[in-house]
Amino acid sequence: MQIFTRNINQWAVKPIDQEIATAFREAVSKANLKLVIAHDSYLINPASGDDTLRKKSIQGLVTELERADLLGIPWVVAHPGAAGEQDRTVAVNRAADGIIESLRKTKKLSSGILIETTAGQGTCLGDTFEEIAAMLHRIDKIKSLRERVAVCLDTCHVFAAGYPLQPKKSLDETIRQFDNTIGLSRLKVIHANDSKRELGSHVDRHEGIGQGEIGRAAFKLLVTHPKLKTVPFILETPKEGDDGKPDPKNDIRNIKLLRRLES
């Protein structure tokens, strides 16, 4: 399960009371949830060329890590940010350095950061495995931080970025590229999302499982692939029904479908 620990559209954040943190931990244990992760605020951009925004973003990551640690959450999923008008290589390095700074400022905590693959919409970084690998390589130079940074692969994002997920031969090649460039040992979570847009569109628009351009057949290949069998899949599919209102049945439908495809 993935949660937000704060309002994702505001910089200001209310502290978590210890009583609430304890109750949350007890609820997770009682529900027998195998994994709970957090997602960071959408305002955060550690790659920003604006020093003021970047400073706020780094502090934002620190806050996310502190809140996750208090709640017993091992990972915070974070987008690497956007380059804006900067050279992409410069922006990649700034993103990595921002993550380094946030991890150093929380060195006594155990929670870490999962860098999320992106669709590459606009100037967003992380739409190629090479860019993610470059960030990891820069962070890994500080050995004490290596265990606190890994990767979250989003199926919609990698598909929109141009990585095919079917037929099996194409999925095998995508996984091979990921392993050779980043390493499957760094893959901790998969966001399971279909895509409203076509392969290589670079448009980040999620769709329900089997209802988009990725398709049901590709998700069957994904959830049964031997190299992904130990990686948790977490939904980020749309919550709204046909009337545009939140419909909790959507999550139930998507979970049941993934489980059927896995069997």
Tell where the protein language model's regions lie, with residue ranges.
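N-terminal hydrophobic or amphipathic segments with adjacent small-residue motifs
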Residues: 35, 75, 204-206
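Acidic (Asp/Glu)-rich catalytic clusters
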Residues: 16-37, 64-72, 103-109, 137-148, ...
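N-terminal pre-domain/capping segments
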Residues: 1-40, 44-65, 263
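Hydrophobic faces of well-ordered beta-strands that scaffold small-molecule active sites
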Residues: 1-3, 36-40, 76-78, 113-115, ...
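Alpha-helix N-cap and loop-to-helix initiation/capping positions
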Residues: 12-20, 48-60, 86-98, 123-134, ...
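Histidine-acidic metal/acid-base catalytic patches
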Residues: 133-263
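Active-site beta-loop-alpha junctions enriched in small/polar residues
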Residues: 4-8, 40-43, 81-83, 116-122, ...
